[in-house]
A protein has these predicted regions:
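C-terminal cap of thioredoxin/glutaredoxin-like
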Residues: 84-183
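Structural alpha/beta surface segment adjacent to cysteine/selenocysteine redox centers
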Residues: 2-72
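Mid-domain, small-residue-enriched loop/turn segments at the edges of structured enzyme/sensor domains
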Residues: 72-77, 81
């Protein structure tokens, strides 16, 4: 919700990179299906809030399917339900999770390119998820633990914006469009 408010107020531009490198941690190609659906939604639903809400829904703690031996299969109907819950029309949601996976080649190519970009590597020199950059600078999420803060508060501090300024048009982050994260 915070990112959507920032985006809608023109305080933030968001670049999303959907990746499928976690497929091996599920028994049913979860990453391929969930992000093929996201791409379909992005291409067929004109409201970016719907896509962002869908992504929020699938990353919600009570929806995460686990990994490896803790993985619980998630069928396409459950993914479709999360899309509709996010405001996506039933027709678009049904097509997004029809099983066709028409964006799989694109998703795989994007994945293979993105995970090899050195500017996205963590402090250990490898790609990890989630990865966030601020004005092209890698933002180390481990610093949140060291600072004893949550992701939203840490992010707002890093861009130089107070919580009461979130979603307020004209109130821009103090780092501007080219500054490095503050923390």
């Amino acid at each position: 919700p915070t990112l959507v408010k920032l985006m809608n107020a023109g305080q933030l531009n968001i670049d999303l990179h959907f990746l499928n490198f976690q497929n091996n941690k599920s028994s049913d190609n979860y990453s391929n299906r969930v992000f093929n659906g996201a791409i379909y939604i992005a291409e067929h639903d004109d409201d970016p809030d719907h896509l962002m809400s869908y992504l929020s829904n699938i990353y919600a703690e009570d929806f995460q399917p686990g990994e490896l031996s803790n993985y619980e299969p998630v069928n396409n109907a459950k993914l479709e339900k999360q899309a509709v819950k996010a405001g996506v029309s039933e027709d678009v949601a049904a097509a997004a999770f029809s099983g066709k996976n028409e964006y799989l080649d694109w998703l795989t190519a994007s994945n293979n390119y993105t995970i090899l970009r050195p500017e996205l590597f963590n402090s250990s020199g490898a790609f990890s998820s989630p990865t966030l950059t601020i004005n092209g600078e890698y933002w180390d999420l481990k610093q949140l633990t060291l600072a004893d803060t949550n992701m939203v508060d840490g992010f707002l501090k890093s861009i130089g914006l107070d919580a009461d300024q979130v979603g307020v048009e004209g109130k821009m982050p103090s780092i501007g469009a080219s500054g490095k994260p503050i923390s």
